Swiss-Prot record:
Its EC number(s): 5.3.1.16
Molecular function (Gene Ontology), one example: 1-(5-phosphoribosyl)-5-[(5-phosphoribosylamino)methylideneamino]imidazole-4-carboxamide isomerase activity
The name this protein goes by in its record: 1-(5-phosphoribosyl)-5-[(5-phosphoribosylamino)methylideneamino] imidazole-4-carboxamide isomerase
Organism: Archaeoglobus fulgidus (strain ATCC 49558 / DSM 4304 / JCM 9628 / NBRC 100126 / VC-16)
Keywords, in A-Z order: Amino-acid biosynthesis, Cytoplasm, Histidine biosynthesis, Isomerase
Compartments, record wording: Cytoplasm
């Protein structure tokens, strides 16, 4: 089932939106993450996408209690600073459904493959794309892998992928359609799309080319998109 998923980015105990993931470029802030999560679920969200930005910038999980509370409300996928498999298992203990791995997916391929075999269906590989190459370490470094090359290292396992185009992340400027279509159609496993989604048509496009869902942040928090409208695409024939 195609899912429209609100993003909840946590930084210093608050929900924030950052322009292109830059720590000092905050475009939205709310002080109560639990209330924000509750509002999305009440409107109809079945899945929530939670990123521990403090964790991503500092390399360790920082919002355990908030994440545990949110995990009681809906299906939850969590990422940000998860560079240790024990942390991932701790998240599963807290009730998290899927854990998102970024840097580890590039630097520790064999270990993550083994972990994914142990936790079938619960590993999500982040494919963060910057000008057609994969970015790691809080999007600060770019490696010589294309998004599809990274995904192919895991596509024979029971995993899912999160494809984020950093070039348009947080800009509410629309998506890069050819790149999304290429990634989705190259892979066997479910691909969720994030970065730049700013219209109902962007969501419909992702569904039409076979994405498993979309993650939306800035467009919802800046009110460019109404979640009540966006979620209807889950049930549309496109």
């Amino acid at each position: 089932m195609f899912r429209v998923i609100p993003a909840i980015d946590l930084k210093d105990g608050k929900v924030v939106r950052l322009r292109q993931g830059k720590e000092d470029e905050v475009t939205f802030e709310a002080t109560n993450p639990i209330e924000v999560a509750k509002q999305w679920v009440e409107i109809g969200a079945k899945v929530l996408h939670v990123i521990d930005l403090s964790g991503a910038f500092q390399g360790r999980l920082r919002h355990e209690e908030i994440i545990a509370e949110i995990a009681k409300m809906a299906e939850v996928q969590v990422g940000g600073g998860i560079r240790d498999f024990r942390v991932a298992e701790r998240l599963f203990e807290l009730g998290v459904d899927r854990v998102i791995f970024g840097t580890i997916a590039v630097e520790r391929v064999e270990e993550l493959r083994e972990f994914a075999k142990k936790w079938k269906g619960r590993v999500m590989v982040a494919i963060d794309s910057k000008k057609g190459r994969v970015a790691v370490k809080g999007w600060k470094e770019v490696v010589e892998l294309t998004p599809v090359q990274l995904a192919e290292l895991y596509d024979d396992l029971d995993v899912s992928f999160l494809y984020t185009n950093i070039d348009v992340e947080g800009l509410v400027s629309g998506i890069e359609r050819e790149r999304i279509e290429e990634v989705v159609k190259s892979l066997r496993n479910p691909v969720y799309v994030a970065g730049g989604i700013s219209s109902i048509e962007d969501i419909r496009f992702a569904k039409r080319v076979g994405a498993a869902g979309v993650v939306i942040g800035s467009a919802l928090y800046t009110k460019k998109l109404k979640f009540e409208e966006a979620i209807k695409v889950e049930y549309e024939k496109v």
